[in-house]
Amino acid sequence: MRKLTKMSAMLLASGLILTGCGGNKGLEEKKENKQLTYTTVKDIGDMNPHVYGGSMSAESMIYEPLVRNTKDGIKPLLAKKWDVSEDGKTYTFHLRDDVKFHDGTPFDADAVKKNIDAVQENKKLHSWLKISTLIDNVKVKDKYTVELNLKEAYQPALAELAMPRPYVFVSPKDFKNGTTKDGVKKFDGTGPFKLGEHKKDESADFNKNDQYWGEKSKLNKVQAKVMPAGETAFLSMKKGETNFAFTDDRGTDSLDKDSLKQLKDTGDYQVKRSQPMNTKMLVVNSGKKDNAVSDKTVRQAIGHMVNRDKIAKEILDGQEKPATQLFAKNVTDINFDMPTRKYDLKKAESLLDEAGWKKGKDSDVRQKDGKNLEMAMYYDKGSSSQKEQAEYLQAEFKKMGIKLNINGETSDKIAERRTSGDYDLMFNQTWGLLYDPQSTIAAFKEKNGYESATSGIENKDKIYNSIDDAFKIQNGKERSDAYKNILKQIDDEGIFIPISHGSMTVVAPKDLEKVSFTQSQYELPFNEMQYK
């Protein structure tokens, strides 16, 4: 039994937990005030959307892009329509003429140019996003028409402009010295909520924007409340101090499967899950020259040591489906099957022997040239499911004669390691439905992505060039075939081991309607939600 379950049982026995019989005063007050208060393990951070210090779920309430990516493709948002030149290098956007920033400043072509130029001033920071390297210039054609010129054709351009950041819009009056790369004075966007009171590491209020250009929010306020994951978040939801939780963009799941079930069983809450949004994976660092993971045969062996079916069923409680390939088939251009290695310990053992790592008579750990087969794995300590998976894999690796040292760190530290290459193995995830496949594939060769992980591939330059070429292809079938070829080579290298197809989980009051999802695991349409 989990620690949380034991804690809950003791509190229930002592009568300290409120029961779900309609007597939860905290929930009733929030409904009356048309308010949601969600639990989060981290402060919302810096709400400047042109850098990466803030919570994307919070930023998406404040800021908006030119276009929206939906299950039916790219749709208008701040741009009511657009034209693309025959050579695919010029995008002309025709803007809405009824939009204002939260500070009253009109949203127009000049504001669009200033914002995109501001993002481009810091383009090294955005190199993981291919379009940032291709924007040549932005021209104002008239008050509500703007022209975006690329250095070369790039088919995913609109999809990348539709992302929650960085190509979203801040009031030019908030710029510092005419730009945003060194911060902004305030956080005025065009979205359905305005940032209200923000108490660092405690809470942040997002108040309804009564002057919003689109359909106004049915909620008066959404509040983010900072607290530890686990018992604290669970009890807060039980008492009605908070009444909403979701798998956030920092990789954390504040509530584990036991607490989700208990909250639902009270009758006060509903639990909803999205379609597959991304792929949870194990990244094996081919560039770690001082470790056995630099050996392709060892990486392939590790691929046969991951029992994704057992992980999905027993650790993830069936909430996520086993991932047999890096991208699910609901991802754009991924209309093919490419099964990765199956769980097979005998095959793993054979590959380790082939790589020269032998089991000795006096040790359970394999050795080669007098050196033990030892690896370090990193997981997000804010994710209880990652911790459980790490512990499970530690036991599996031990069976194979590998000493696996597991380390829990913050999501920020994990991201730093991904960039620096200071890891043997780590848990990570694909960029997500809104971004993929282009963003994760582009990240295979980017410093801020997985360049360190792929740097040990013998023919990496050839693969990197294939990636650049694929992004120029306008024909859908040809582009899909190009992606398939790239992914086949990457899978053969054993660097990205898919585990499960992750979805977004929401816990909401039972009487909250229109709880839905977008194409992104990084945002929720709070403005559409309403109480019965």
UniProtKB/Swiss-Prot annotation:
UniProt keywords (A-Z) are: Cell membrane, Cobalt, Cobalt transport, Ion transport, Lipoprotein, Membrane, Nickel, Nickel transport, Palmitate, Signal, Transport, Zinc, Zinc transport
Family in the record: Belongs to the bacterial solute-binding protein 5 family.
Phenotypic consequence of residue 418 to A: Does not bind StP/metal
Note whether Signal occurs among the keywords: yes
Family matches, as InterPro entries = CntA-like, Peptide/Ni-bd, SBP_5, SBP_5_CS, SBP_5_dom
Q: Where, per UniProt, does this protein localize?
A: Cell membrane
Q: Name one GO biological process term.
A: zinc ion transport
Description of what induces expression: Repressed by zinc.
Protein known as: Metal-staphylopine-binding protein CntA
The record lists staphylopine as bound by 165, 418, 448
Q: Spell out where lipidation (N-palmitoyl cysteine) occurs.
A: 21
**Effect annotated for changing residue 52 to A:** Strong decrease in StP/metal binding
Topology relative to the lipid bilayer, per the entry, is: Lipid-anchor
Q: Which organism is it from?
A: Staphylococcus aureus (strain NCTC 8325 / PS 47)
Query: Gene Ontology cellular component?
Result: ATP-binding cassette (ABC) transporter complex; outer membrane-bounded periplasmic space
Per the entry, what this protein does is:
Part of the ABC transporter complex CntABCDF (Opp1) involved in the uptake of metal in complex with the metallophore staphylopine (StP). Involved in the import of divalent metals ions such as nickel, cobalt and zinc. Binds the metal via the metallophore StP, and transfers the StP-metal complex to the membrane-bound permease. Binds one molecule of StP/metal. Binds StP/Co(2+) and StP/Ni(2+) tighter than StP/Zn(2+). Plays a major role in nickel/cobalt import in zinc-depleted conditions. Contributes to virulence. Required for full urease activity in vitro.
Matching Pfam families:
SBP_bac_5 (PF00496)
Fill in the domain comment. Answer: StP/metal binding triggers a notable interdomain conformational change.
- Secretion signal, residue range per the UniProt entry: 1-20
**One of the record's GO molecular function terms:** peptide transmembrane transporter activity
Q: What happens when the gene is disrupted?
A: Deletion of the cntABCDF genes decreases nickel and cobalt intracellular levels and decreases virulence. Insertion mutant shows attenuated growth in several infection models.
Which PROSITE patterns did the record assign?
PROKAR_LIPOPROTEIN (PS51257), SBP_BACTERIAL_5 (PS01040)
